[in-house]
C-alpha cells in the first residue's frame, strides 16, 4: 500500500516524468493506453483490497473523477480548482484529460459518484468517465508540476446517505489529513497492472 499523499507528491515532483513524456508523445490512443499500462504503476484511489467491510474493501473516503479527451485542459483544470468539492486536480497521464479527487462517504460510493457526475456535468458541462463508479478502478500515476491540492475543501460526505450537499468545517479540516497523510490505498506495479 501507499498513501494518497505519496501519490500526489509523486505526480507533482516528477517521479514518473520520463515515462509520462514518452506516453504523451505517442499519438495513437491505443498505443498510449498500452504504454501507460506498461510503464506506470497504478493505485486504487478509493481504498484497499482485503479491507474491513463485508466485501473485503476498505474505502479511503476519496472518489476519483476522470474527464477524458478534454478540448481545453487548462480551462477544465481551472474549473475543477475553483470547485469547492475538489481537493485535488491534475493532468492525466495521457495529457488529454484531467483527474479530480473528491472526498465522499465511502459507504455510499456509487451514489456519491452519481451525484458528483451530475454536479460536474450540470455546473461545468464536464462529462465524467464511468470507470470510477467502481471503487476498485485504477488510477495511474501522472506528472503535473502544477498539481492542485486544496488547502480546504468542502465536505461532500452527505452526498451519500443523506442526499444533501454539506459544507462542514470539521470534515473539511479532517480532509487535509486524510488526503495528504494517512489514507492507505492499493499500489499496483506496472507488471501487476499488465495482468489485470
Feature roles, as predicted:
Residues 1-96, 103-112:
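Signature for HUH/AEP ssDNA processing cores
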Residues 91-98, 133-138:
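Short Gly/Ser/Thr- and Asp/Glu-enriched loop/turn motifs at secondary-structure junctions
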Amino acid at each position: 500500500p501507499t498513501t494518497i499523499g505519496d501519490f500526489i507528491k509523486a505526480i507533482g515532483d516528477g517521479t514518473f516524468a520520463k515515462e509520462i513524456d514518452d506516453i504523451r508523445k505517442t499519438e495513437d490512443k491505443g498505443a498510449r493506453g498500452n504504454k501507460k499500462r506498461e510503464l506506470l504503476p497504478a493505485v486504487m484511489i478509493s481504498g484497499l483490497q482485503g479491507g474491513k467491510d463485508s466485501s473485503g474493501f476498505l474505502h479511503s473516503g476519496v472518489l476519483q473523477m476522470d474527464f477524458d479527451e478534454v478540448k481545453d485542459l487548462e480551462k477544465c483544470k481551472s474549473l475543477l480548482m475553483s470547485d469547492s468539492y475538489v481537493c485535488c486536480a491534475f493532468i492525466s497521464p495521457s495529457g488529454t484529460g484531467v483527474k479530480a479527487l473528491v472526498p465522499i462517504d465511502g459507504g455510499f460510493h456509487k451514489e456519491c459518484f452519481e451525484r458528483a457526475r451530475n454536479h460536474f456535468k450540470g455546473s461545468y458541462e464536464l462529462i465524467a468517465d464511468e470507470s470510477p463508479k467502481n471503487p476498485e478502478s485504477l488510477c495511474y500515476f501522472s506528472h503535473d508540476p502544477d498539481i492542485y491540492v486544496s488547502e480546504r475543501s468542502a465536505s461532500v460526505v452527505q452526498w451519500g446517505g443523506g442526499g444533501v450537499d454539506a459544507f462542514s468545517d470539521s470534515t473539511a479540516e479532517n480532509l487535509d489529513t486524510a488526503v495528504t497523510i494517512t489514507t492507505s490505498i492499493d499500489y499496483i506495479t506496472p507488471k501487476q497492472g499488465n495482468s489485470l
